[in-house]
A protein has these predicted regions:
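Short S/T/G/P-rich N-terminal loop/turn motif that feeds into the first structured element of a domain
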Residues: 1-38, 86, 90-100
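Short, functionally important structural connectors and interaction interfaces within domains
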Residues: 2, 41-44, 79
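Short, well-ordered beta-strand segments in beta-rich or mixed alpha/beta enzyme
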Residues: 5-9, 46-69
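Short, glycine- and small/hydrophobic-rich beta-strand elements in well-ordered beta-sheets
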Residues: 30-54
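An amphipathic, aromatic/His-enriched active-site/gating alpha helix that lines ligand/cofactor pockets
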Residues: 60-90
């Protein structure tokens, strides 16, 4: 399956909440993604420093399913969510060799 990267920034409203509900909200987000996109397989989930708050690496059957993950994320308190296609480095090198 293709690999995608989801970068998420929380909304100011979500950041203004107390810290306790974050884990519960994160799990409800994950449950909703699993319910609506059962073919998605999450590989990694990171909290990051910088312009984004979270970075997820996941596999999905196609870009439409990856877009659904972004839309669900936006509906669950993210002020911004972007999904990017990721090509594994070894595959990228194969593509380069094909170009000769």
């Amino acid at each position: 399956m293709p690999t995608y990267i989801l970068a998420t920034r929380l909304s100011p409203e979500a950041m203004a909440k107390k810290f306790e509900p974050y884990e519960e909200e994160g799990l409800s987000w994950l449950d909703l993604v699993k319910q609506k996109c059962p073919d998605v397989k999450f590989l990694e989930h990171y909290t990051i420093l910088g312009p984004w708050d979270f970075l997820d690496i996941f596999e999905a059957p196609n870009e439409e399913v990856a877009a659904k993950v972004s839309m669900i994320t936006s509906s669950c308190g993210a002020s911004r969510a972007e999904s990017w296609t990721a090509i594994p480095y070894r595959r990228f090198m194969e593509i380069m060799r094909e170009l000769g």
